Amino acid sequence: MRRQKGMTLVEVLVALSVFALAGIAVLQTTARQASSLSRLEEKTFAGWVAENQQVQLRLEQRWPEASWVRGETQFAGLRWHWRWQGVETGDPQTKALDVEVRRNKDAFAADASLRTYVVKQ
C-alpha cells in the first residue's frame, strides 16, 4: 500500500472551519475593544466638563444653591448637559457641590459625577 502525501478534503474543511471561528472571535474582540475605547473617551470628556463647571463656579465665587442649576456646553465637538447643586453640610460655612454631566439630557445615569466642597469666604 502506498502512503499518501497531503491532506484529505475533510481535513482541509476542518482546518478552514477552525480558522474561520478564530477569525470571528478576533473580530468580535476587536469590535468590543473599539466600543469600550469610545465609551472611555466619552466618560473622560464628561469628567473634564464636570471639572470645568466646578472651576467656573469657583471663579465666579458663587455660593452653591440648594436646587439644581442646569445648563449645557460644547466640549470636544460634542454637546454636554450638566447640572450642579449645593448640599448642606454640618458647617454653615461649607457646602458640598455635586456636579453631574450627561451627553443625553434625558439619561437617568450621569456620564460623570463629581463632588467637591466649597468654603464661604
Swiss-Prot record:
Gene Ontology biological process terms from the UniProt entry: protein secretion by the type II secretion system
Cited InterPro entries: N_methyl_site, Pilin-like, T2SS_GspI_C, T2SS_protein-GspI
Gene: outI
Propeptide feature ranges: 1-6
Protein name, as recorded: Type II secretion system protein I
Transmembrane segments: 7-27
Family stated for the protein in its record: Belongs to the GSP I family.
Post-translational modification as stated in the protein's UniProt record: Cleaved by prepilin peptidase. Methylated by prepilin peptidase at the amino group of the N-terminal methionine once the leader sequence is cleaved by prepilin peptidase.
Oligomeric form and interacting partners: Type II secretion is composed of four main components: the outer membrane complex, the inner membrane complex, the cytoplasmic secretion ATPase and the periplasm-spanning pseudopilus. Interacts with core component OutG.
Compartments, record wording: Cell inner membrane
Modified residues (N-methylmethionine): M7
Main location as per UniProt: membrane
Function: Component of the type II secretion system required for the energy-dependent secretion of extracellular factors such as proteases and toxins from the periplasm. Part of the pseudopilus tip complex that is critical for the recognition and binding of secretion substrates.
Keywords on record: Cell inner membrane, Cell membrane, Membrane, Methylation, Protein transport, Transmembrane, Transmembrane helix, Transport
Annotated membrane topology: Single-pass membrane protein
Pfam families: N_methyl, T2SSI
UniProt keyword annotation of Ion transport present: no
NCBIfam families: gspI, IV_pilin_GFxxxE
